Amino acid sequence: DISLTATARLFAEQFERASGIKLPIKKEAVTTNYIALVVDKSLPKEGYSLVVQPERISIVAADYNGALYALETLRQLLPKEFESTTPVKTDWAVPAVTITDAPQYAWRGLMLDVSRHFFPKEYILKTLDRMAMLKLNTFHFHLVDNEGWRIEIKKYPKLTEIGAWRVDQEDKLWNERTPNSANAFTNPATAPKKYGGFYTQEDIKEIVAYASARGITVIPEIEMPAHAMSAIAAYPKLSCHKRSIGVPSGAVWPITDIYCAGQEETFTFLEDVLTEVMELFPSKYIHVGGDEATHTEWEKCLKCQARMKDHHLKDVHQLQSYFIKRIDDFLVSKGRTLVGWDEIMDGGLANNAVVMNWRGIEVGKKALEQGNPVVLTSDCYIDNYQGLPDYEPQANGGYLPLKTLYHYSLEKENLSPALQKNILGTQANLWAEHVGNTEHSEYMLFPRLLALAEISWTTDNLKNWDNFINHTQTFMERLDVMKIKYARSIYQVLPTVENQNGKIFLKLECEVPNADIRYALGDTPIEKATKYHQPIALNRSTTFKATVFSGKATNTITTGEVIFHNAIGKKMSYSPVYHKKYQGQGEATLTNVVRGTKNFQDGQWLGWLGDDVTLTLDLEQATEVSEVRIGAMDAQSSGIYFPIKFAISLSTDGKNYREVATHNEPCIVRGKPSLKDFALKFNSQEARYIKITLKNVKTPPKGGDAWLFIDEVLVF
């Protein structure tokens, strides 16, 4: 079929590169030793059948994408050397199989943030190749954010002349970068080094065409009304305050520099921009962001207040809704469909708009009940760590290992079949605040994109973790040939300490079933490690080392410490009670000897939002004490801060307390998550009750939430 020529050519060209064997593409029938491609529109959309026999390979596909995916399946049946860029001598054998397949979901995507860090066109094209290999069909191109405008708009050249460039602070962690002056580059003699880049319209045309040939739709994202400081830096008149600002080099929170919703100039600008964008991107969908706007400028702006009065809008949330609906009307008039993050529902939303759900399934369910199509992404943020943070490159504060992503289900039990049908699919989101180069990007993408590909293609009843992880390890050999710098976090040993009725056990596991885990306690070197079979009973404090072996250590050596102390198993009371979102293991959390990790969602942390906290520990009998340690977390990208003051008071009767130690901890900006045991020492004395007072920072230096997280109280 002539419509399948392009996909046949893609396969033939790669096979020739890898094997040196040319596969001619012919329209006329041949009798033996051929690959036949036939269209059968009765098959499900993007579906195919693949039959491999000794004399022929037959492919019947529903459409272009179906044929493409059949050939991608054939690619994976061929030896891994198929991925070579130079000819390799090997046995190019394919097992005899019959496969019939079709995707469960229409939207199988990847979002790549190129604003926070810019990635060259060549890397985008490579990423599209890799998406096609995994049968992903939607590339969400995050082209605009505060930290950089990445697409040429001919009517507004300053968007790339100014908005695409910022002061180079790449030597600093994202959350430690300082604000930039609007005049930073005015004087060439004193101007700092620039960081940035953008895609010309010719680049965009090439990317879109390249994607289309691989069955991928490119959906551009042009953020509004917030995440637009790069545009406001170029054209200050677009804001309410009209002040010149610099393009930020790092974290901005809260986002108060947003487009003015009260002036017509803003909508003229956005319609002009979107008109050029739509000329470049033929996709049905146009993403407009719509998230994380702080409306303080709208509340002060006379034009915004006049707009609210004229349109009978009761608050700034309804003004945000007006803003999004107006852009929606414009896109609909051009035959396109608006997509936005789930904040676009605030204040009401047209039923045709697509909601990209990121704030949890309950918000997604609300969108479905309103009749909106939904893309579920809340548990697919691959900017989060995929292994223990101490052994991983810098990432966002969350934790999303391969196994967790694989078990993400789009089949929600609390949804009716009618609502379930409105789930378009899912995508992985790779935000790039901490991802500064292509190797780091590859590391975050692989192997997690394999899991994303399976959960967006396959129904839950056909998923099998053991099979998947075995296939993943085999697929890693293919990634090696492709020279992809993927993560090996699945081989990382994950230690947990369990308190079973007062008995303490060290449990070691990793994501690979039946892995050969070896461990050593205390000063024993890892070379003399013991094979792990079952949880290790402990009766005293110890350090440990553990790794996975395959003839030798296959990954980073995980280290840790278990500390025994006088408060284990003792009762703790809390004032106020910890937040319902972060309840750890309940009341016993802080005295169970089990320590939290840098993953604040690991179930071992108690959290308080904005509160000062008083903890009261009952040791059950008078005990000689001289030191109290409080385990705390600082993860400022997630709004978590160390307490700024600690106080220890002792009592023998639970009524009369005497303060014995205090400590003040300055609140400083930290770019990485940090764990610390704050040790308060005092003269040895008897006490049964210990009162620990913790002061919350309440107003962080960069704004936002002020969480206080504690995992253990240790008494000596």
Regions found by a protein language model. Give the residues of each.
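Surface-exposed loop/turn motifs at beta-strand-loop junctions within extracellular Ig-like
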Residues: 63, 548-552, 696-698
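Structured core elements
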Residues: 111, 140-142, 217-221, 260, ...
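Flexible, acidic glycine-rich loops studded with aromatic residues
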Residues: 338-353, 359-505
